[in-house]
Amino acid sequence: MTAIGLMSGTSLDGVDVALIKTDGRRVSALGPTGYRPYSDAERSLLRQALAEAGQLTRRDDRPGSLGEAERMVTLAHAEAAANFTAQHGIAREDVDIVGFHGQTVLHRPAQKLTVQIGDAAALAKAIRVPVMHDFRAADVAAGGQGAPLVPVYHRALAQSLDRSGPLAVVNIGGVSNISYIDGHETLIACDTGPGNALLDDFVLRVSGQPFDAEGRLAAQGQVDEAWVAAALQHPFFAAPPPKSLDRNEFAALALPKLTPADGAATLTAFTAGAIAGIVPLLPKLPLSWIVTGGGARNLSLLRMLREKLAPASVENADALGWSADAMEAQAFGFLAARGLKGLPLTYPQTTGVVIPMTGGRIARP
């Protein structure tokens, strides 16, 4: 079937769009990809919604700015999908399903609470295609972490690689997560810790820029190794997989007074150290690490990962013919296809749910 995936991640950069052809088990073709960036005003609204979401106790409540943010997210996704299909000459009749993740504003699996804003019914009416949404709720309700969801897609991609031995796919968005794949049977996944969120927030605060482009600011700085070592003592890092995080889990960690470059270098090293720290908790040492997400564009982060993970290889997913930028959008197209067929999206080894769980709900035009 033909599926389009839509993803707005915790980095708050914009909406990624991707088309894939899949039967929900294997990927037969990767189609075009697209991107609709958020404006500064839209990003500011999302940051406000994230701050206010910390007070939520029910997943359907939309107090304060959350209602306005939900409308904005829905319209942005409708615009992204419409522009994408028009640009690539894709008829809506040829699209079987759209996978719509929405925007996560709160993720507290211990409280069985995960909140993604975005009106799937309104989106389905706007684009006139069935929309699969609400991918995390069933897993969380059944006692799982509800994250990460992308590992089953990583496994499908890895099946096409001519590689022996275990490998790891690391997605570095607002939060970092890993998929450990060893053959067809072993799939282990978890969040590893911070991704770009802490760094992006810091860079915005000190420079007005939304992120550290290519890691150039961090490349000019010195890492405060003592601060990183102390931050890595957080109990999350010693817990075995599966485990997951809210975007703002480490927001309370205060950097000492550092220059912008030193602060960026230190937070980049924190992300790299957290990813490398998962290795002792895995069954075997991965022979290769494939990096996706916005972090794959951060050359300082890639350099630190290569230093910490040697002698294993560390490579950008683009080098394999995958898409580092559109990986999660592709994944939600894939997950929508799996959901349509009632196939599992999550497993005990990926989210801690007791039994393999399907998920997602359909909104029809």
Swiss-Prot record:
Pathway: Amino-sugar metabolism; 1,6-anhydro-N-acetylmuramate degradation; Cell wall biogenesis; peptidoglycan recycling. One of its GO terms (biological process) is peptidoglycan turnover. Coiled coil: none annotated. NCBIfam families: PRK09585.1-5. It holds the Pfam family AnmK. InterPro entries: Anhydro_N_Ac-Mur_kinase, ATPase_NBD. Belongs to the anhydro-N-acetylmuramic acid kinase family. Gene3D superfamilies: 3.30.420.40. Its EC number is 2.7.1.170. This is Anhydro-N-acetylmuramic acid kinase. It comes from the Bacteria. One of its GO terms (molecular function) is phosphotransferase activity, alcohol group as acceptor. ATP binds at G9, T10, S11, L12, D13, G14, V15, D16. Catalyzes the specific phosphorylation of 1,6-anhydro-N-acetylmuramic acid (anhMurNAc) with the simultaneous cleavage of the 1,6-anhydro ring, generating MurNAc-6-P. Is required for the utilization of anhMurNAc either imported from the medium or derived from its own cell wall murein, and thus plays a role in cell wall recycling. It catalyses: 1,6-anhydro-N-acetyl-beta-muramate + ATP + H2O = N-acetyl-D-muramate 6-phosphate + ADP + H(+). Keywords: ATP-binding, Carbohydrate metabolism, Kinase, Nucleotide-binding, Transferase.
